[in-house]
């Protein structure tokens, strides 16, 4: 679990997301509270439950991006799901319990990766010995068994030195590696993914682990052997328990498009994908026990962050019980022209930086001037105002249109420098932006 302070978390998010300080502060405090809770004594820790968050704001203002960046910062089991993918229990489709199963799977993967990293040094030594055994086969005794000499031979030491220095990287050897099972591919009916994954695991375990000889270059063989030896050093039962503990104590679930499962107005008849889904989410958010193939998982201390545009529905259209379980409300603001300018220049991997790097691969040097950036931002904002407002995503559309000619001719422009200023932007975009019909369909 990350021990970053709220100020450090916000500072890190500022590198990628412009504005939305309220949302950043809310997720930063929620993340820090996870760490604070773990410092309490066990009795009080059990009583402290996470304060779930509801993020409200139009599309393209950074809700999903905050979740994506938070996942990397958290160093904790994290999953992002779309509320629209689930249906009420009893109907064909994914049940909400699969959220916790997927979260547990991601935790298993994360914990296994950490365990392999911890054992990497020992695994590298064992892999090195296996390669040396192939290069210099050990002597055998009268019973045909390998003899372990008291001291390694000078030839073995010489090969070890060459191996570590990379002199043997391109030499090809034949070595026994664990055979990768092709498995049995089972097409999962909707809502039965859990059962089919268990069947696949059962078929894969039949016959046990087999060794298969493969011819590889030493450099490639070393990588595969290190992974194989590290996996042997990992205790699978301990790994499962560690992953379940990580999910229960530090897990974070981000539910996007929560507004799409709101019941709008009075309607009769079954509402499979809306109110029923909300009711199924209630026990997860409140705290229940979910059965997974790795064991039982309690959801009492999992943090839930829900988000939605709420353009047609409003947060009050959520069922009252779910509203009560999302106590922290954060409203994200629509983006202005100034925000667009900052989005184009401030993030460490902004869209303009990406385009410069892409064109640089063809030997074309692109320069964006401040007035050019302002003009692009103004064009994107104007199209958002006249057509559908899709927030920062509009910048991708506008820039792609602006760079189309350069991208097409880039291979013929090797060694040239192109400056994108206000005049260049006006020449390529003004006509499209001014014509509402054209901008609606092209930008």
Curated annotation (Swiss-Prot):
InterPro entries: AAA+_ATPase, ATP-dep_Clp_protease_ClpX, ATPase_AAA_core, Clp_ATPase_C, HslU, P-loop_NTPase. One of its GO terms (molecular function) is peptidase activity. It is found in: Cytoplasm. GO terms for cellular component: HslUV protease complex. The keyword ATP-binding applies. Gene3D superfamilies: 1.10.8.60, DNA helicase RuvA subunit, C-terminal domain, P-loop containing nucleotide triphosphate hydrolases. Residues 139-158 are annotated as: Disordered. A double ring-shaped homohexamer of HslV is capped on each side by a ring-shaped HslU homohexamer. The assembly of the HslU/HslV complex is dependent on binding of ATP. ATPase subunit of a proteasome-like degradation complex; this subunit has chaperone activity. The binding of ATP and its subsequent hydrolysis by HslU are essential for unfolding of protein substrates subsequently hydrolyzed by HslV. HslU recognizes the N-terminal part of its protein substrates and unfolds these before they are guided to HslV for hydrolysis. Belongs to the ClpX chaperone family. HslU subfamily. This is ATP-dependent protease ATPase subunit HslU. It comes from Erwinia tasmaniensis (strain DSM 17950 / CFBP 7177 / CIP 109463 / NCPPB 4357 / Et1/99).
